[in-house]
Amino acid sequence: MRKTNSVLRIAFAGCLLALLACGEAEQQASGQSEPIVNNVKGTLIDQTAIDGFVTSPNGPEAGVWVIAETDDLPTLYSKTVVTNENGAYVIPDLPAAQYDIWVRGYGLVDSPKVNATPGQSLNLNAVIAPNAAAAAAYYPAGYWYSLLEIPHKSEFPGTGPDGNGISPNINNQADFIRRVTSGGCLACHQLGNAAIRNLPNLFSGYDTSTEAWNRRVRSGQAGGSMTRSLVGMGDQRTLEMYADWTDRIAAGELPPIPERPTGLERNIVITQWDWADPTAYLHDVASTDRRDPTRNAYGKLYGALEESANYLPVLDPVANSSAQVPVFTEDPNYNPEPPAPMAESPYWGDEPIWDASTSVHNPMLDQDGRVWITARARAPQDVPAFCQEGSDHPSAQAFPLGRSGRHLGVYDPDSEVYTPINTCFGTHHLMFAEDEDNTLWTSGGGRVIGWLNTRQYLETGDAAASQGWTPFILDTNGNGRRDKDYVEPDEPIDPSRDKRINSGYYAVAPAPDGSVWGSNLSYPGAVVRLKPGDDPSITALTEYYELPLDDNGDPIEGFSPRGMDIDRNGVAWVALASGHMASFDRSLCLSPLNGPEATGQHCPEGWTFYTEPLPQFKNIDTPGSSEGSYYTWVDQFNTFGLGENTPINTGNQSGALLALNEGEWIRLRVPYPLGFYTKWMDGRIDDPAAGWKGRGLWATYSSRTPFHMETGPGTSSKVYHFQMRPDPLTK
């Protein structure tokens, strides 16, 4: 699987290392940065690069990171590379500036920072960690989180506050695990990083760690939602679980040791820019038209700030600068009061730092570079008449709607005009179909899925006429068409009629064949396929495929999806709370895809599972890991370099993107600042003829808590550009 020519490179680099050690290593051992001719490849030094060797008392340090950071540019900028087998490194394509350079790696502590400019060679001294605890401070959050002791299988179903403290609504251990990974707190921020595994001083005055945790989860504007999550699990038992975890860590318990980057992982180059502001948090980023990633080449990127602020952050990666685009609702007087902090925050005190009225969740670029977003256009209760019962709107006649909390909007960079778009259906994620109408499909509609014909909307400006929605109807009578007469979700299957289900989409992903896939949260969860038909409001049919369960209702392997995507072959790829990536291929199904038995558990053979590369929770003996990625994104067009249809998980506990390459994981780890956490990525090809330099993945720091990163309060969100060069020394 490893495609680099390692034998030749090892021999060549080994000879160079020996020559350099004789003639020049002594002059540079202290970090001296005089320009030289013979760099790590024995050629003239590139005037936009910094290179050298990393050594320690143990010899060359392979698979460690060399980081260059500067604040000389319009926004904070850094670039990170990995050393090869001989400890050699090359940091390419650096803008002219003064940089701090240092070494970070597993088994090390950070080396002293050395100042340098592009065009210099710089040998660096790595610093061996003085003890195991010092080394573990740099491990990904998921390694620490794997020390969590999940309640035993025998404790389920829960017996409530007067019993074992676990909610009686949780029937098995798997559903509990879902809530401690991507179905709970991990959906908003990383767990296991230093900010979480250590209790802040604000909570030091309590008699027990359980009491301290009870106070902790009430902090800040998210205190209410955190408290509700705990109550849903059974707050007393859950608080005891987390208190035990942090107590053991405080007493010196350490996690397993991660391996250093190897193989293709050493070819990764990561460039970072700051954007937004220290009190805002990002959700997603968009760089191009998903359907043609050569569009918007070298162009600006746009982000979404969800509940934190009323603007779109903008990054210009060529000018290394950031900006803001204001967004707003249709009613300028709609300005709801931001939620007050439930209790004092250890970072922000009693200050409410989030104040968005627009709730921008997800951006997407179209074929002309417009930025389409899911955003609030009006107050949720101000429902247009055309949405409701009695309207002549075709979708309302089929299935009228009431309130919805988030809608659509579009920003045109050419005219610099933003326009809110009032929709009847709620929205969350959005993605364009490959059709002549440039149909924008959305998730987040609950009982329905909604869409906007953007061609029609741009031509007419008529939002009502350009939108539509449909409920989710299973073809349970097996006649191959949708019938007007169907049974409701709370009614039993009738083999002579179709059935409506409440399988609201979380993710949404139009496929090349015109179908629209999505993920359904909960336990065991499902992927859902919608076939729109000629008139989706009345013709769309749904297929529903649950994660497989055994006769006891326990998972056969993985469970509980969150984000998902589709590849060019119509295979769905999904991130699971169980710590897996899974694929679902409906062409493998042996049973009928419609009829009275096609209600969820009818195609276990369509599923394949890939355990994410983190340790499993300490006391769990079932398949999975302590990961639980937020989203799966498929690189359909080889924007990164691992090939078409490469599925990539967001790796929220790994501090990395996790690319599945020929059945093996490639970890695109972000070592600095610790705490990388993203909810989405995008891939763009800026120049198809430029090799690795003309393509790459884009992501943003998406946690609600940028102040949890190692750089602490004052840290803003970041944009990350991941690129993969042919070898670690390519400039």
Sequence positions of predicted segments:
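Short, ordered, surface-exposed loop/turn motifs in non-cytosolic proteins
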Residues: T48-I50, S56-D72, L76, A96, ...
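Beta-strand-rich domain onsets/edges
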Residues: E24-A49, F53-G59
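A short, solvent-exposed loop/turn motif at the edges and junctions
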Residues: D71-L76, Q98-G119
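Short Pro-Gly-centered beta-turn/loop motif in secreted/extracellular proteins
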Residues: E61, V90-Q98, Y106
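The canonical Cys-X-X-Cys-His
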Residues: T181-N193, Y242
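Short, conserved, GDST-rich strand-edge loop motifs in beta-rich repeat architectures
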Residues: A195-L202, N296, G303-E306, I373-S404, ...
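Short, acidic Ser/Thr/Gly-rich low-complexity loop/linker segments typical of extracellular
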Residues: D71-D93, V114
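Structural signature of eukaryotic scaffold interfaces centered on beta-propeller domains
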Residues: A276-A297, P352-D368, H429-D437, P495-D513, ...
